[in-house]
Amino acid sequence: MFAKSVILVEGDAEEILIPIMVKQTLGVSLDELGISIINIRSTGFENLAQLFHNQRIKKKCAIITDLDTSITGQKTEASKRGKTRKEKLDALKKRNKWIGVFYAPYTFEIDFLKANNKDEVLSTIKDVYVDKTAIQKSEKDINSKDIKKYGKRILTMANYIGKGWYAILLSNYITPTTCIPNYILDAILFVKPEYSEELLLQIFSYVVSRYEQSDKIKSLNKNILKCKKGELPLTDLIKELYEKLEK
């Protein structure tokens, strides 16, 4: 609670993987961003979120939860609960400026995979299964473009060994090129809307270092040094990066 802002989650997977994804992709930790992540488990978002208020704790609080939309397109008990949960949390958000709510359309596992993270998930298959047939079937399902197939498969794998254990397995394959799902990025930007130029430059330098094998990106190193010395505005450096990546 002593962080500058808080993200509330309801699962082990989010608690384990969000800090790792942020560190690997941005080069900074949640602690460096002044963000604490709290797993409420069965406590209920409403109970804890009420602490963040004009008369209580004046800090931004982002709630991350699943809508549990059915991958078959049919209404299920889980999707009904997701709809009810959204109605309650949206009402809570409307009457409290300190709270933001961000939804995974399906579940964390499915939306992580949908965010262009197929390679990371494929890498976990041989850690989950030893049977050759099961491995081949799983690879085929994950490579499918049909959400009913790849969605069911990743949930099957996660439930097979437990979602917490699966998150730990998956964490071994998170790299700087892993994509953070948009709803998680939105939650981070809600609780941390402003960044110092020093922190932005640190993130920028880390991101550029991921492309160090590219000649067109290597040329940015000189201007990064200029920016650190105050000889070049950070906005000019960012503009130059976008121009080079678009070529």
Regions found by a protein language model. Give the residues of each.
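Acidic, divalent-metal-binding catalytic cores of TOPRIM
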Residues: 1-247
